[in-house]
């Protein structure tokens, strides 16, 4: 079962959708389709042990300089150790590592949010450019950890606010420490446990209120461990990677997340098996998403807090990551949003305040212009736009 696939190699154009999702089994870690695709691609029998380097025409892959032998009962298998790379900082700078001339790409987040026509701003977000020290990972295996997330609340702001305040704290507490055989498997388990614990904490607090809180929230989180992105997603917020394609000499929008709505076969089957139903594209005719934090009244009907988790290795061809709630994607396709941001980044007329680097001013302007444009196009929802710059 293909649980944890990789993005397309960077020199290739984005792949078309692979068609229908596999029926009857959950696919949490699959190959990442192009952003316009709604179905998941199917790949080979790759699990979590060894991550193939993302090939690049002239950039090469990030090499490792050592390997470790992992012994199992009756047989041994060689596995490459992940890159040993420098600790990241709040400022976006190129971080070079002597080991095999590897480079950790700097990450820095920017955000803009608009209430739109809603009475209340129910979105929340988190930007943590570097939480390596807080996570305290094994320095021989992991040397930079970053975290970026957007949360789109419904039924109130309490679930999204709770997730923004607590999910990364739970992640830090559960982050792998000590000896690790497989970083990929351990990080995956950490994310699954973190989402489960955060949801349980909120539901406990919500049920203790009188009347009980009925708030819920989507969650789209990008956890960067050195040059590997782990994307955990619940609901219909999205993460998109802008990657330059050397063959077409154009930038492509690659989807890093999978939307969860009750009309999808796998989601609908789970809901019906739990005793719920889907009417008018909604759980029990009310809830638009099939996975969320909170929504206690729907958890007994098959709505789950188990995230879809995907993995992507950054390459020198990657420009930025876009995280946004559905308020943006109701009026922008992923390709349109990526091209809009690129046009802003190339705008020489953007003014820079004294003491602020020009690149920061352009990314801030890109976030604000895209959020404004979404409102102008008629998005009636809250709009949150986060762009994570990838430095080379």
Swiss-Prot record:
Residues modified as N-acetylmethionine are 1
GO MF term set = metal ion binding; protein serine/threonine phosphatase activity
Extract the Pfam families matched here: PP2C (PF00481)
Q: How is the cofactor bound?
A: Binds 2 magnesium or manganese ions per subunit.
Cofactor requirements of the protein: Mg(2+); Mn(2+)
List where Polar residues composition bias occurs. 56-70
Subcellular location(s): the record lists: Cytoplasm
Q: Which UniProt keywords apply?
A: Acetylation, Cytoplasm, Hydrolase, Magnesium, Manganese, Metal-binding, Protein phosphatase
Binding sites annotated in the UniProt record for Mn(2+) 1 = 152-153
* EC annotation from Swiss-Prot or TrEMBL: 3.1.3.16
Q: Which residues carry this modification: N6-acetyllysine?
A: 210
Basic and acidic residues compositional bias: what residue ranges?
72-91
Q: Which stretches of sequence are listed as region Disordered?
A: 1-91
Name the chemical reaction catalysed here: O-phospho-L-seryl-[protein] + H2O = L-seryl-[protein] + phosphate; O-phospho-L-threonyl-[protein] + H2O = L-threonyl-[protein] + phosphate
Q: Where is the PPM-type phosphatase domain?
A: 108-390
Q: Name one GO cellular component term.
A: cytoplasm
Q: What is the main EC category here? A: hydrolase
At which positions is Mn(2+) 2 bound?
152, 326, 381
Family membership, please give it: Belongs to the PP2C family.
Subunit:
Interacts with ILK.
Name under which the protein is recorded: Integrin-linked kinase-associated serine/threonine phosphatase 2C
Species assigned in the record = Mus musculus (Mouse)
Lineage, opening ranks = Eukaryota, Metazoa, Chordata, Craniata, Vertebrata
């Amino acid at each position: 079962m293909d649980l944890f696939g990789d993005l397309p190699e960077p020199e290739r154009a984005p792949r078309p959708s692979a068609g229908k999702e596999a029926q009857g089994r959950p696919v949490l870690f699959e190959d990442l389709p192009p952003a316009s695709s709604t179905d998941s691609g199917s790949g080979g029998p790759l699990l979590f042990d060894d991550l193939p380097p993302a090939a690049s025409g002239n950039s090469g892959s990030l090499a490792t300089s050592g390997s470790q032998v992992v012994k199992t009962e009756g047989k041994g298998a060689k596995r490459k150790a992940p890159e040993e790379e420098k600790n990241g900082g709040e400022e976006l700078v190129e971080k070079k590592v002597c080991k095999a001339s590897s480079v950790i790409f700097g990450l820095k987040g920017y955000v803009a949010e608009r209430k739109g026509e809603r009475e209340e701003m129910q979105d929340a977000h988190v930007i943590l450019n570097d939480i390596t020290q807080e996570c305290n990972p094994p320095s021989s295996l992991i040397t930079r950890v970053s975290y970026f997330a957007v949360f789109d609340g419904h039924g109130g702001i309490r679930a999204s606010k709770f997730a923004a305040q607590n999910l990364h704290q739970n992640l830090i507490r559960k982050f792998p420490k000590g000896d690790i055989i497989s970083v990929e498997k351990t990080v995956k388990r950490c994310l699954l446990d973190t989402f489960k614990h955060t949801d349980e904490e909120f539901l406990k607090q919500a049920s203790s209120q009188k009347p009980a809180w009925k708030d819920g929230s989507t969650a789209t989180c990008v956890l960067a461990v050195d040059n590997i992105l782990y994307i955990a997603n619940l609901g219909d917020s999205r993460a998109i990677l802008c990657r330059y394609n050397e063959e077409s000499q154009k930038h492509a929008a690659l989807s890093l997340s999978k939307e969860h709505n009750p009309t999808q076969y796998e989601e609908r089957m789970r809901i019906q098996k739990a005793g719920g139903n889907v009417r008018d594209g909604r759980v029990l005719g009310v809830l638009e998403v099939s996975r969320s934090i909170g929504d206690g009244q729907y958890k007994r009907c098959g709505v789950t807090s188990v995230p879809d988790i995907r993995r992507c290795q950054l390459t020198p061809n990657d420009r930025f990551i876009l995280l946004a709630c559905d308020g943006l994607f109701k009026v922008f396709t992923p390709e349109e949003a990526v091209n809009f941001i690129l046009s802003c980044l190339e705008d020489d007329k953007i003014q820079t305040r004294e003491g602020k680097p020009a690149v920061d001013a352009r990314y801030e302007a890109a976030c604000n212009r895209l959020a404004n444009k979404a409102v102008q196009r008629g998005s009636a929802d809250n709009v949150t736009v986060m762009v994570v710059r990838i430095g080379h």
